Regions:
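Charged interaction scaffolds used for protein-protein
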Residues: 1-48, 53, 60-97
Length: 97
């Protein structure tokens, strides 16, 4: 999976346009926000349960793939590293704090 910081130039604008809405939708959830500062694992678990579609949209856009392709590629072992990569981005972290 590509990191957000690896997306450059005009493609960065396209990816940002695609991921902004699902990220904001997740970030506006008070339950998710409340857990972000104290228990990131709990926060991620809540987001995974409530926002599956949005999470797949984010991963797909970052990687330049369809949601279908992304959902077929993600498995139990790769999902945690995808989540860590996205949450490690300072800009994404600021949305939740």
């Amino acid at each position: 999976m590509r990191k957000l910081s690896e997306v450059k130039g005009e493609e960065a604008l396209d990816v940002l346009a695609e991921i902004l809405e699902p990220i904001v939708e997740i970030a506006e959830d008070e339950e998710v926000r409340a857990g972000f500062d104290t228990n990131v694992a709990k926060c991620v678990a809540i987001a995974l349960k409530k926002y599956k579609k949005q999470i797949l949209e984010i991963f797909a856009s970052i990687n330049g793939k369809s949601v279908k392709e992304t959902s077929e590629e993600i498995d139990l072992l790769s999902l945690p590293s995808y989540i860590v990569d996205v949450l490690s981005e300072p800009a994404v972290r600021r949305l939740f704090t």
